[in-house]
């Protein structure tokens, strides 16, 4: 999910990425913590739970049923075709499951069709309305595509609660990059302000934390992403905590590796940071 004009296939679904163009308290006060990718080992054991992640990235009813006590599941959908046969076949098996938190409808949908197949707000609205009607209490979630640049983010003409009926919105403000020789923590403020100005209130925002670096990703400044240090990760959590002090859940990208990057599953220093954060919130 790092920002670039690259697509990824995961579990048969298409992931698009976040940009259209190529001590003090840490973090937010939330009880649910999500880390994408590689949540289960070959025996089906849930891995991120060991450091307090209690919202699982699930793609099957079997995974949802297997979750430990106290862990909920967020189910990947990734279609944006409205309430058609494929959508119903995907979501119906989860309805009524006590471990279900909700549905991850889309990752960086394109409202224009310029960069990826167009995702109509009305299709997201139909999907959200169906879920709210037939799975009462389940949440719908998307990660917004930045239609601008990291220096001047924009979500104008994109999705918000009014036009999509989606409950919760994330966005990828990943501040630690090679061309900066450090991290631009103010990037987080800029993204929050841009989302707010596009009609997404802070009460509907899901903090998305950078917890990866390296690999094949290229950012919109021509550099590459750098795995945050312990101090930098603490600042990311603190910055988000000041901007969005409560949230339905928060989101670390990512637990498992994609495109050869280093992620939480192999960074024990950052696991310690997130263990502290997750246990305190």
At which residue positions do the language-model features occur?
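Extracellular cell-wall/glycan-interacting regions and their flexible linkers
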Residues: 1, 14, 23-27
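Glycan-processing catalytic domains of CAZymes
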Residues: 25-281
